[in-house]
Amino acid sequence: MDHAESAVNKEGSSLKISGSLPVIPTPFRDNRIDFDSLLRLFDHIFPELEGYTLCGSTGEAPSLTMDERIELMKFATRNTPPSKTIVVGLTHTNLEEMTRLACTAEELGIHAGLVPCPYYFPNTFPMVLEFFRALDRASGLELVLYDNPVYTKTWLTADQLLAMVDACQH
């Protein structure tokens, strides 16, 4: 998510994302999240970056349990200066679990959720639009589209992206 200009800039949306917010890896030791190493990574990146993205593909999100993802979000919010932006990947094949992640992220004060189009099954644009509307209605978390058509098998046009912006409040 490097050099993003902004999340949805709509009335009621005050989030402004700027700068470099790379997806950071999730370190492991003995098959468990290595929070000491993650804290050292934070100490290394905070002077250089405006924030970071947690639980993206590079952050091993598809391999993490829901409890591990939530534990990571809690750790991140406790150990990140308020001046830094935190975006969290909400990738999941189940809308209910994505909603749970989004609501938890919002409660913890995370700034935005990185959301891919539904994946695994082929999508039509109306399906994608309703998916984003449902996630948007369920949470007040700002949503950032993770456009990865190779893996989601969903290619979006500029007009479709604009329709998504119009359809969502966050």
Which residue ranges define each predicted feature?
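Basic phosphate/pyrophosphate-binding loop/patch that engages nucleotide-derived ligands
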Residues: 166-170
